């Protein structure tokens, strides 16, 4: 079979990173729960409710920081010239949600819309962070689920919120995520009681609270919360380097997008036991993707991810001697003409797309506030 394809832009270039840290491995699955039918959530409007929580202040050396927002001295001392600088406040998390909204509305070509509400109150939980942390190298997320339960009970009992107006729920918590394989990176894990970032689904909660669990009751039991994304305020931490401490700069932008991708039904596309890359930097649901550019600029979802979410209708190759123009996907000109499906067997196929970082050749100007 001969296939003639005119590539309007010939280079196929993976996203690269400035000063990309080496051997960054995400050390656990993103999702706790089965994948939901993608069509039910991946198209149309998702209404997001997000809250900010901190913990009882502590001096526990097994966690990073003091358990409260503003408790990471190494960030406070570096000013605003780093990724995800202080203050981590209402404005900071609003910008995170704006990034999430823009990312999905752009990469879906408008098929996915997000409307969000961030409550302005910082809610303080009843225990120090370490008491909500799962045991190290364990899949027992009971303590973390209890933190989620306490959070929504606290919000429901102290704030007038109509929870029925929302579909997806996010908890932004103080501190650093327990998401990097620090043993592989540095040879030791200095903060084993930090909290892992996780997307809880209903059946994940049911594994913990029982098969009859139908969500956390709120609004006098008239509404139930059946999902929650647990996201840290930052992934940046100090590690020991030659000559002293070194700041490992990692933003949560990519992690937030990947966690929302998990909510939409996308599977993890990396080895969740070892953290090793699966699809690399050409997609969202791989650590090399959502930690691309130090986590600040995740790549667009891969061709398969867009197809799985119902965002793409590829042109399927049916005959021989076929001539196609394949525009760069990132131009977002005609998304349904930017993906070709080539059947191999009844169950296997190739997806062909043209990926370009700078298809117009004009470069990008970034203004960082």
Language-model regions, residue ranges each:
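Zymogen propeptides/activation segments of proteases
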Residues: 3-7, 16-211, 336, 341-369
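Extracellular hydrolytic enzyme modules, especially secreted metalloproteases
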Residues: 168-170, 174-368
